[in-house]
């Protein structure tokens, strides 16, 4: 459930707050910020295709989610650095890759994992449970990240997302390693 909640915490947190970030960090107007934000979900399609392609090579959903979270962590770190003068183009590129990777994780936890575990648990129930965890992450990001931004700024918001992503990466890779050692 950690993977699902953190996935939408990052994905929907950025979708919700990107217009404000672009306006405050880079001085973009409201219209430009909104239009650029509307493009982010398009990267989700590529995230779904990426998850399918990676699933051919990495069959363990824990490891696959962990690998995607490693990528998310690097991109979030890059996003943090881009706020220090790298420019809006690099920031938008990183936001696109982050969106792609977050959608890939979402596919892993709401579709691939339940199918992989179908012999042990009702896959429909598990998919619904994971989907509900994604909504918990979305809700936490909408309110929580706004509060953090108001109190400590956008760098703190990205650091919180980065911490959650690193924790998820470590959990996924560790769980995959424990499973293999059995």
Where are these regions (language model features)?
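Helix-to-loop junctions at the C-terminal end of transmembrane segments
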Residues: 47-60, 149
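A membrane-interface helix-boundary motif in multi-pass transporters
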Residues: 145-166
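Extracytoplasmic gate region of multi-pass secondary transporters
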Residues: 1-51, 106, 110, 141
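Helix-to-coil boundary motifs at intracellular loop junctions of multi-pass secondary transporters
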Residues: 21-26, 57, 112-120, 151
